[in-house]
Each structure stands twice: as structure tokens, then as C-alpha cells.
């Protein structure tokens, strides 16, 4: 016979037991953490409240992301809180945020083995699969070892391979006849053309289009059309998945999946072409020069492995350099005195116009252009390619700064804790760059103070995961800037908005267009 009292007592007793277990667990965990903190000699980080489980912060962050002001919001948050390291919740996940150089150094270098990528692999896998930017441990080491030869000095030094792409870019500039045009879209096409040639052995030739009467001359294949837009869209979703922390799986709509499919189709063209090559053809490619894809085919014939590695390096080869060039010309167009000083250096070393000495523009000679180097440093300071990143603790550990009344004591980092580090905010900190830290001023890089920055200047990450392609990016950007200065001495801005709205996905670029004129 059904006994209400018996059932009631049964559930009441189990609720009581469950509650007791939960309380006991939290008490035990609290005591354990206190013991570990004492052993490590650290304290808890300061905590900031962000509403119910941080869902308000997630909403606010997504709103700023849509408006192109997310990195500004994150920087201003440090200023509002008044601390360079603090703890908060977003979408229910506890996160520690820091812009302290000592903490970033610990994350990336001195305590490298204490931290890993955590949820990034799962967040990025639908687009990037298993590659250098998504893997940890032996998988990451293997990917890095495969990529390293591609970025050896001999490969990076071949700047002359960029010239045909510069000539295509120049056709688009001349088509504007001295009027305003969007240079950022052209830079993204330029860098994907050079990256595909450099990495895959064949350029996608995206600059050869109908507007300059060269569409029929360009290589065409199934998957090329719509690739750029799909790649951009997929990255937007990856960045939202990253913001959502452990709730990333909720961001998986039809547009995201469709974009991934289009990008994969693009990469599969190059993969199949390499897989269809005979051993003799592969050997000939090797003799002509190191091409990443064809060397990789000698190690594996798994099309998914090949595709994943291609997309990982294409992301770095296209987006970071295009963003760097776009921000550079955005600032140059607004600062004619900087443009004049830059041209003076370029013309003195390499000539100009019809008297340009292309044979003098080499990897070595570009590195000796001191003002050009200062210009790129200043652009990378104000607009770092990867403005924010994160790591996840592999074990109970600590970071050296952020605790105590003076924020100079080590803080406790629990196993599984997410730690974000914001290079964008650190690069604009008055403590390191003075009262004019928000001002674009390349001359600061000739001042003694900038030689003592250490980890306070971090445009290419640091530690064992430091960017393999930094010299490739700097060399390509330097060559493009030098050649455009030689070909088009007159530069003007047609963009009144300052500061610019910035799209911060996996890398950073302008939210919309970069309107300039060159003649």
C-alpha cells in the first residue's frame, strides 16, 4: 500500500544526506586549499562581482564584441577595478585576469608546465582540428617540429617572392585613381596569396579578379569562392565559444557549421593535390625549396592531419600580417610626419619610383631600417595581433603577483583554473609606457626606457610557444610597407573615427574598413 509518510521520509533523508555531502565536500576543499596556499606561500586573488554567476558579464562582453569595443572594455575594466590581477566569473566559470608582466612570464615561460590550453582544443576543433594552436603536450611538440623548418631563416629571407603579389596589389590601388579605397580587404587578399604560395607551393591568387581584368588568369577550384568570408565567420564563432568558457558547446549553429565546411573544402583542394603527387614530384618540390605541405605529405598521408595543420598555419600566415599592415597604414595616414620620416629612410636605402632598387631590398637590409622597425613596434604595441589569450592550470600552483594589500604577493591558482592574460591592456599601461601610452609615437622606441620593458612588450607571445612565424610576419610587412612607399608617395586618411573599432576574434583587425588613398 502506498505510504506518503514513508516516501516523504525517504526523500527527506536523502536530501539531508546529499546536503551534508555537499557541505562536507566544500569544507574539505576549503581546508585543502588553505593547506596548499600555506605550503605555496600565496594568498587568494582579489575577487570582483559580476552579477549572477557572471552571465551579465558575458552579455556585456558579447555586446562590446559586436560593437568593436571589446578590447577597450577589457582594458577599462582593469582601470575600473584598480588592480592588474583579479578574479571573476563569466558564464559560471571562475576566471583570473591579469596584465602583470611577471604573471604573464610565469604563465608562458618560467611555469610553462603548470599550465595548458584547457578547453581551447574543444572550442576550436570544429574549424582548426588538431594543430599547433589547439594541441598540448606531445601533439603540440610534434606540430611545432614539423612547422619549424618552414620558418627557418633561409625560407623567410626569400622576399623576392612577394613582388608579384605587390604588383597585383598596386593594380588595385591605381584603379582607385587617387581616391579612397578599403586597404584592409586588399591586405587580407595579399597575405592569403603570399601565404598559400609560401606554405602550399601555389598561390590562391585572390587579388587577380574582375575589377582589374585578371579573373580568367587566376587559379580556380571548388571551394575557393566564399572561402575568405567563411574563414572570417568561423573565427567569429570560435571567439564567442572561447568567451563562453565551458559552455562553448552551446555555440554551434548552422552558420558556424556551414562556414567550417566551406573552409575545409578550400583546404582539401591543396591536400588532395599533394596526396596525388608522385614520389618523384614530391622530391622535385623539395629540390625547388622547402614547401610545408609537400614535406608533411612525406610524414603522413592522413588527409585530416594535413588539413588541420594547413588551416592552423594559414590562420597565422594570413590574419596576423593583414591586421598588422592595416593598422600600420591606418596610423600612417593619420600621422603625415611619421609617413615622411619613413619615406626618407626607405628612399635613402632603396630608392623610389622608377629609381627603386629592388635588388637592395633583402631580409638583412630591411632589418637595418631602424625607423621602420620602430614603426612596426609601435603598431604592435597599440594593436597586438592577439590582444588576449588564456591558459588553464594543470595542477594547484601560484602566480607571483596580485595578492595582498600592495598586490605584490603570490596568488593561488587552483587546478583547472582559467587564467586570461591581456597583452592589449599591458601594452597601454602608463606604468611601462608613460603618460602618453595611448598615443601613437614610433620615436618612443629610440628612448632608453623601452630597452628595459622585458615582458611588458609581448607582440608575439613568449616562452616555448613563442610565435614561430614572427620573422616571416615582420619581413613580409616590412617589404610591403617599403614597396608601397616607393610606388605611392602620397598617402591620406579618409576615416574620421578614432580610436578605431576593433574586431577581436582569434586575431585582431579593424571592425570594418580602413579607408585611405594612395597616389
UniProtKB/Swiss-Prot annotation:
Location in or out of the cell: Membrane
Cofactors: heme
SUPFAM superfamilies reported in the protein's UniProt record: Cytochrome P450
Keywords: Heme, Iron, Membrane, Metal-binding, Monooxygenase, Oxidoreductase
Gene3D superfamilies according to UniProt: Cytochrome P450 (1.10.630.10)
Enzymatic class: oxidoreductase
Superkingdom field: Eukaryota
Keyword Signal among record annotations: no
Membrane recorded as keyword: yes
Main location: membrane
Protein function: Together with an NADPH cytochrome P450 the enzyme system catalyzes the terminal hydroxylation as the first step in the assimilation of alkanes and fatty acids.
EC numbers on record: 1.14.14.-
UniProt organism field: Debaryomyces hansenii (Yeast)
Record gene name: CYP52A12
Residues the record lists as binding heme: 467
Family: Belongs to the cytochrome P450 family.
Cellular component terms (Gene Ontology): membrane
GO MF annotations, alphabetized: heme binding; iron ion binding; oxidoreductase activity, acting on paired donors, with incorporation or reduction of molecular oxygen, reduced flavin or flavoprotein as one donor, and incorporation of one atom of oxygen
PANTHER family: P450, PUTATIVE (EUROFUNG)-RELATED
Protein name per the record: Cytochrome P450 52A12
InterPro entries recorded: Cyt_P450, Cyt_P450_CS, Cyt_P450_E_CYP52_ascomycetes, Cyt_P450_E_CYP52_fungi, Cyt_P450_E_grp-II, Cyt_P450_sf
Amino acid at each position: 500500500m502506498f505510504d506518503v509518510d514513508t516516501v516523504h521520509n525517504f526523500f527527506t533523508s536523502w536530501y539531508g544526506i546529499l546536503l551534508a555531502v555537499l557541505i562536507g565536500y566544500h569544507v574539505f576543499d576549503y581546508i585543502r586549499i588553505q593547506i596548499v596556499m600555506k605550503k605555496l606561500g600565496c594568498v587568494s586573488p582579489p575577487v570582483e562581482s559580476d552579477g549572477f554567476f557572471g552571465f551579465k558579464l558575458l552579455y556585456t562582453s558579447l555586446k562590446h564584441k559586436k560593437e568593436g569595443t571589446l578590447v577597450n572594455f577589457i582594458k577599462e575594466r582593469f582601470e575600473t577595478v584598480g588592480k592588474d590581477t583579479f578574479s571573476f566569473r563569466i558564464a559560471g566559470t571562475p576566471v583570473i585576469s591579469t596584465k602583470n608582466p611577471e604573471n604573464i612570464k610565469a604563465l608562458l615561460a618560467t611555469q610553462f608546465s603548470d599550465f595548458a590550453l584547457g578547453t581551447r582544443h574543444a572550442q576550436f576543433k570544429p574549424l582548426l582540428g588538431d594543430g599547433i594552436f589547439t594541441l598540448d603536450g606531445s601533439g603540440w611538440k610534434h606540430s611545432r617540429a614539423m612547422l619549424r623548418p618552414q620558418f627557418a631563416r633561409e625560407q623567410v629571407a626569400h622576399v623576392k617572392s612577394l613582388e608579384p603579389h605587390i604588383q597585383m596589389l598596386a593594380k588595385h590601388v591605381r584603379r582607385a585613381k587617387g581616391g579612397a579605397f578599403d586597404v584592409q580587404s586588399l591586405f587580407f587578399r595579399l597575405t592569403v596569396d603570399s601565404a598559400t604560395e609560401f606554405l602550399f607551393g601555389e598561390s590562391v591568387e585572390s587579388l587577380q579578379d574582375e575589377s582589374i581584368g585578371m579573373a580568367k588568369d587566376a587559379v580556380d577550384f571548388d571551394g575557393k569562392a566564399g572561402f575568405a568570408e567563411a574563414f572570417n565567420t568561423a573565427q567569429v564563432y570560435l571567439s564567442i565559444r572561447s568567451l563562453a568558457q565551458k559552455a562553448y558547446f552551446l555555440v554551434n549553429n548552422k552558420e558556424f557549421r556551414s562556414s567550417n565546411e566551406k573552409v575545409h573544402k578550400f583546404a582539401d583542394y591543396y591536400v588532395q593535390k599533394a596526396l596525388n603527387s608522385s614520389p618523384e614530384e614530391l622530391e622535385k618540390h623539395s629540390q625547388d625549396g622547402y614547401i610545408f605541405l609537400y614535406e608533411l605529405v612525406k610524414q603522413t598521408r592522413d588527409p585530416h592531419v594535413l588539413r588541420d595543420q594547413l588551416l592552423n598555419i594559414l590562420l597565422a600566415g594570413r590574419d596576423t600580417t593583414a591586421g598588422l599592415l592595416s593598422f600600420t597604414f591606418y596610423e600612417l595616414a593619420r600621422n603625415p610626419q611619421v609617413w615622411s620620416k619613413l619615406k626618407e629612410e626607405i628612399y635613402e636605402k632603396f630608392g623610389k619610383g622608377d629609381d627603386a632598387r629592388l635588388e637592395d631590398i633583402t631580409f638583412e637590409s630591411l632589418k637595418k631600417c631602424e625607423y621602420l622597425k620602430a614603426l612596426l613596434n609601435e603598431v604592435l604595441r597599440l594593436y597586438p595581433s592577439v590582444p588576449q589569450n588564456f591558459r588553464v592550470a594543470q595542477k594547484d600552483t601560484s602566480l607571483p603577483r596580485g595578492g595582498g594589500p600592495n598586490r605584490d604577493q603570490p596568488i593561488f591558482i587552483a587546478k583547472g583554473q582559467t587564467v586570461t592574460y591581456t597583452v592589449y591592456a599591458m601594452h597601454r599601461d602608463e606604468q611601462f609606457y608613460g603618460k602618453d601610452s595611448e598615443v601613437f609615437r614610433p620615436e618612443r622606441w629610440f628612448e632608453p626606457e623601452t630597452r628595459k620593458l622585458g615582458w611588458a612588450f609581448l607582440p608575439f607571445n613568449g616562452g616555448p610557444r613563442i610565435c614561430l612565424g614572427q620573422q616571416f610576419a615582420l619581413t613580409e610587412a616590412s617589404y610591403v610597407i617599403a614597396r608601397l612607399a616607393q610606388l605611392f608617395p602620397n598617402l591620406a586618411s579618409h576615416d574620421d573615427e578614432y580610436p578605431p573599432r576593433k574586431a577581436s576574434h582569434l586575431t585582431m583587425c579593424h571592425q570594418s574598413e580602413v579607408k585611405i588613398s594612395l597616389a
